Every structure is written in C-alpha cells, then in structure tokens.
Amino acid sequence: MLAAVASFLDARKQGGQWLLRVEDIDPPREQPGASDEILTALDCYGFEWDGPVTYQSASREAHDEAIKALLEAGKAYRCGCSRRDLATAPRGSLGVIYPGTCRARCDATEAALRVLTDDKSVSFDDRLQGHQEQCLETESGDFIVHRRDGLIAYQLAVVVDDHLQGITDIVRGIDLMDSTPRQIWLQLLLGYATPAYCHIPVAINDRGQKLSKSHGTKRVPLDQPERMLFAALQTLGQHPPAELNSAGLADIWAWALDNWNIQVLNAQTEIIPFLNALAETENGLS
C-alpha cells in the first residue's frame, strides 16, 4: 500500500505517468484471484493509472528474445546445478553465491540459464538511499535468468518489461534494493537505458518485522479507504492536516498531490505505521 501511494504521488508530482503492471510469470506461486483483488483495492482507494493494465505474461516473446540475445553474445550459459549440488557453496546477503560450476560446460538434459557476471562493481545513486555499489561476482555470482522449469526469472522479466514500457523512474520498497544491481547489470548487457531508482523504507510492526503475509498481516480493507489513505500519508511523513481525517478521497488526494515531498524519507530504511489498521495490513500493493 505504501509503495503504491508513494510511487503514484511521485509520478504525478513530476508530471509523469503511473503505469500498472501485474507480475504473473510464476503460476505455481500465484493465488487465484489475487490480481483482481489488487486491482479492486487500487480502484477503491482512488488510484488512477495511465493506459491499460499490462500483464507480464503477455511479454513472454520479448523475454525469450532477450534470453536469445544474451546467449548469442556469450553472456549467458546453461546450468544443471541443483540445490543439492550447491548445498556447500558459499552464501552471502543475497543467498547462495554461485561458484561458476557450469561456466565451462553443462551436460545436463534439463538446465537453467545463468547470466555471466564479473568483478566490476555495479553502482547507482538512489534518490533516498544515496550511492550504492555491489560486486555481483562476489555477492551473488552468475544468476538465473531462465529457470529449469521453463519459467522466466523475475530479474530478467522486470528489466525487459520496464524497457518495453519506457520506464524512466522506479519507486519501490527498500526490500527490493538488493535486486537493483542485478537489474542494472542486465540493462547494461542488453543495451537498455537505466531508470532512476528510489527505494522507500518498508513498514514494520512493533517487533521489527516487515509487514507481510508471513507475519500475519491482512488484506487491504475496502470499507475505509479514506482513513487508510490518511494513515498512509502520515506514515510516509507527509503530515496531512487533522481536518483531512474526515474528508473524502478526492480531497485527501488533492492535498497529497499539492504537498507531496518524498525527501522527508531521506535515508530511512524502516517506518512504523501510524494506524493499527494499517499495521495489520499486508504489503500486497507494494
């Protein structure tokens, strides 16, 4: 919810478009009806997106073309390693650091595809979190772009789709910042422009846990959008006037658009929701 509010307001404040894309490339993990629930909630809260809703699964041909380009350029290779094979591999903040086992050769019948990394740091300047650097070779190793089960990996899909849609600015939760260097690396290999990145702090509960389904948070309520939007603005440090707490959605959005200032979140990584109801809400719109 917070990332949706922040990205929407930031796009509008800069005179840009706010595009809505459903990431539906992992059917085994998708819950039936989840996408429709999110769209219903966004509409209920008064979000207005530009153009039609797009679905990541509709871009499969473009994803495959990107994979083909990486293979033809010698930037990707087949990998037959299983989780068991990598059980003794070193681990870092991003998980297993792939040791390059299949770089030279892979004889497996079924294989994933990994993209080559090197020892150069990938860097970017985040609008809120400042300068960031990551050496992919030592922190993640060569990473998967096409899974053994035939599905496209998220890192590649989101990069291709951002390129297809002409995305220039990305505002999202800081829990996704570790993915950014891998996405920038793919942009460089594929010759894509790199968007400007802005990672907002994630909401946590009173135990310091990120709000998520795994920690018992609930769906975004549809019966009190005004109250929840007001609380979201407070949580994002925007200080809406008290009288807006009893105002309609249109008035709350109008104030938010006039007064939006994302820089009040500068360098923050965690925030605690102002409203108990918001603290109990899952981060499903981020």
Describe the residue ranges of each PLM region.
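Noncatalytic linker/hinge segments flanking ATPase motor cores
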Residues: 59-64, 155-156, 160, 200-201, ...
